[in-house]
C-alpha cells in the first residue's frame, strides 16, 4: 500500500510538532484533530488516546469513575479503592480505519492489591502505525517498515484516609517513526511521571436512594522532551495533561444503578505563539531568537512549560484595534470536556454513552460515544463505538468515524493471602 503522503504528515506532525510555524493546514492523523488553527501539538500523541472500551464509551471520561484495571490511564489513585484483589485487562482498537487499514493500538494492564490500603499496577501500551513504504529520490523504493511507539507504566496507589487516596506512577516512552531509514533520524525516548488524587464516599442527598460521590485529579506525563533528529537539539514536548472531574453514582434499587461523570482536560504544554514575519512571510529573528508578537516563547523546559501553559495563549488579531485580544478566551478553549453516563443491571449488563467536545480552534474534535458490556463470573467484555458530529478532514469525512474499541477483563476477588479492600461506609 502506498502511503507516502501519510508518512510525511505523521512524521512532520510528530517530529517537528513544536516548529516555529505551527499553523499546520492539515489533519492530525493520530488524534484526528483539525490543525488549521493554533492547535497544541506534541510528540507521542498516542499517549492521549483512550485505551479501553468502558471510558471511551462514556465520552472519554475516567478520572473519577469507579476503579477498574484500566485506571492507569485515567487516574492511578483509583487503584487503592479497587475491589478485586487481582485484575488483568486487555484492550484493542483498530485506529483511524477511515484513513488507513492497518493502524492499531493495544493496551495491557494488571493490578494487584498488596495490603488493605495499597495496590500496585502496571500497564503496557503499544501503538502501530502499520506498514509504510518509504521512497527516496526518483521514487526509489527504500523498503516497507512498521513504525511503532510504546510505553510501559508502573504505579503505587495508597489510601490516605477513609475516603481519599493518592498515587505516583513512573513511565518509559519509546517512539520509532522512521525505523532508521532517514540518516538524520533516530528513535526518541522519554521518562515521565504521574501524580493523582481520588476521593469517594457515600452521600445521602436523595430520599430513598443510595449514592456515591467521587472526584479525581490527575496530572500525567510529567517528563522529559523528545528528540527525533540527531542533527538538531530541538526537542518536542510530550503530552503532559491535567485531568479533573466528578462522578455521581445512584443505586436505584438492588438491580439498577446509574452513574454520571464529567471530565475536564487541559494539555500542560505551551501554546504556539505568533511570531513577527517580514514581507516574504519569513520569521524575523533578533539575537538568534524569533521575535514573538503575541504569546510566549515555547522553547522552554517541561516544568516551565506546564506553568506557562495557563497564561501563554496569543489570542486573536483584531484589525480594528490593531492588536491581539481574547487571550483568556483562547486559554479557556484549551480545555476539553467529556460527559458520560453508565447504567448497570444486576451488576451483569451495562450500557454507556457520552459526548466529547474540543474547541474548533484547538482541534475541533466533537463526537458521541456509545457502548455496552457484559460481566460473567470473573470475566468482563466491553465494546465502544464513536460517532463524530462534525467533519474535520478536507475530504468531508472525519478520521475518527467508525472507531471501535474492545476490552476484555479478568477480575479475581481473592489471589494469594492478601486481605481485601478496607471498606468504610
Segments the model singles out, each with a brief description of its role:
Residues 1-25:
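Bacterial Sec-dependent N-terminal signal peptides
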Residues 23-425:
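Subset of outer-membrane beta-barrel
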